[in-house]
């Protein structure tokens, strides 16, 4: 859709839409679990081609997304780099604190293998966020040694879109448990 929109849009928006298209391809790759491809696609976009009024928000979101990708790739050097970038990124409508807390929780659970209750105490804002929160909540419960809660959370997302890596991992866990 973005590709069509970028080609058919008025000239001043065209470059912005093209860059968004590149970034969105990375987000789709992330959701499918292809983290290396996600990193490559998300890193290709040129912030200077984004319409000036959207740059701060785009930088904040892209840094957040790239940090999540690097956490799943277990790339300590890039994790440190994008954490620093996220801390320097300008806030956009008060969303920065939430994104920082979320990435810290993901890093604790996935990279550091430490318990972090963020996903148990925070409410998701939409269905995709609910799936993500259930996935990381299940990993957190697994770190706590709470097999029942882990199973329950994975079961709650196992019937969702099978293309999502959250769902694929939940199914692997449930199949391995039987």
Regions found by a protein language model. Give the residues of each.
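"A position-specific structural signal for the A-helix of alpha-solenoid helical repeats
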Residues: 17-27, 31, 58-68, 96-106, ...
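Short coil/turn linking the two alpha-helices of tandem helical-hairpin repeats
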Residues: 31-33, 53, 72-76, 108, ...
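Membrane-proximal, non-transmembrane interface segments of integral membrane proteins
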Residues: 1-69
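Long, non-transmembrane cytosolic or organellar matrix-exposed soluble domains/tails
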Residues: 116-178
């Amino acid at each position: 859709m973005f590709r069509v929109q970028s080609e058919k849009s008025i000239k001043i928006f065209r470059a912005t839409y093209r860059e968004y298209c590149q970034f969105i391809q990375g987000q789709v790759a992330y959701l499918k679990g292809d983290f290396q491809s996600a990193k490559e696609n998300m890193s290709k976009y040129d912030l200077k081609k984004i319409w000036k009024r959207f740059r701060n928000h785009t930088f904040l979101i892209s840094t957040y997304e790239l940090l999540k990708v690097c956490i799943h790739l277990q790339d300590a050097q890039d994790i440190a780099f994008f954490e620093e970038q996220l801390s320097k990124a300008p806030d956009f409508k008060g969303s920065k604190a939430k994104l920082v807390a979320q990435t810290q929780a993901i890093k604790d659970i996935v990279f550091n293998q430490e318990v972090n209750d963020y996903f148990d105490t925070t409410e998701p804002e939409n269905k995709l966020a609910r799936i993500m929160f259930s996935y990381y909540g299940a990993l957190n419960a697994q770190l706590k040694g709470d097999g029942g809660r882990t199973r329950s959370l994975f079961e709650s997302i196992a019937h969702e879109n099978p293309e999502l890596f959250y769902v694929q991992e939940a199914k692997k866990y449930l199949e391995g448990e039987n």
